[in-house]
Design a protein with these regions (language model features):
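Conserved active-site and SAM-binding loop architecture
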Residues: 1-207
Length: 207
């Protein structure tokens, strides 16, 4: 199993805890306290094709003939709806930002078309200009006991939607002064639900 664009290793660790062979991959090293033996630091694009060899952050060579499951968290900076306000300044298109959106969309589609039987791609609500495919479903962290709401969309291939487990009675919007990687990290409760539900589904489907 490959978790693309994940330095937090939240989902990777959740799958590992269930006994699955899972790796995270990100251009950044895994966060302090993470497991470098499970992390691949570098461009994930070649790995999306499967039948690959790579060196973990800890320096060990691994080979994978195929991935059973690929979960991708492509960067949303230039794709999400909230960033669309920066696309124009004074009524004029900001061409460098438009170019970055096009490149981000290209990578997003590479994730959707990853060569695995089961694929999931996660992102927030996209801007209309990006022309992304319709998402398959959405989730809220509060559905799994987290006290925050942070609507997240999923594009799925051969996977069912993640089902709610324990609704928090009084959730509030997830707002933080931090940006980037911290804001995009998967809550552990959601990571556990993803690993539990999808791994069981895949095991049943493979019987």
């Amino acid at each position: 199993m490959l978790i693309a664009c994940e330095e937090s290793q939240a989902e990777c660790a959740a799958f590992r805890a269930l006994g699955h062979i899972a790796y995270s991959c990100d251009i950044q090293p895994c966060r302090p306290g993470g497991n470098p033996y499970w992390h691949i630091q570098g461009d994930v694009t070649p790995l999306l094709k499967g039948d690959t060899a790579f060196v973990t952050q800890a320096g060990f060579l691994r080979t994978v003939p195929r991935w059973d499951l690929i979960i991708c968290h492509p960067p949303c900076t230039y794709l999400c709806k909230v960033s669309s306000v920066h696309m124009k300044i004074g009524g004029r298109i900001q061409w460098p930002r438009l170019r970055n959106m096009i490149l981000a969309r290209r990578f997003f589609m590479q994730c959707i078309n990853a060569e695995a039987k089961y694929v999931a791609v996660e992102n927030p609500l996209p801007m209309a200009r990006a022309h992304l495919p319709q998402p398959s479903c959405f989730v809220q962290p509060s559905w799994f006991g987290v006290k925050y709401t942070k609507k997240t969309l999923y594009w799925l291939k051969n996977l069912p939607p993640i089902m709610p487990q324990l609704e928090h009675p009084n959730p509030r919007c997830f707002v933080t002064a931090s940006r980037g990687k911290y804001r995009s990290r998967t809550f552990p409760e959601l990571a556990h639900a993803i690993a539990t539900q999808w791994s069981q589904y895949i095991l049943d489907d493979m019987k």
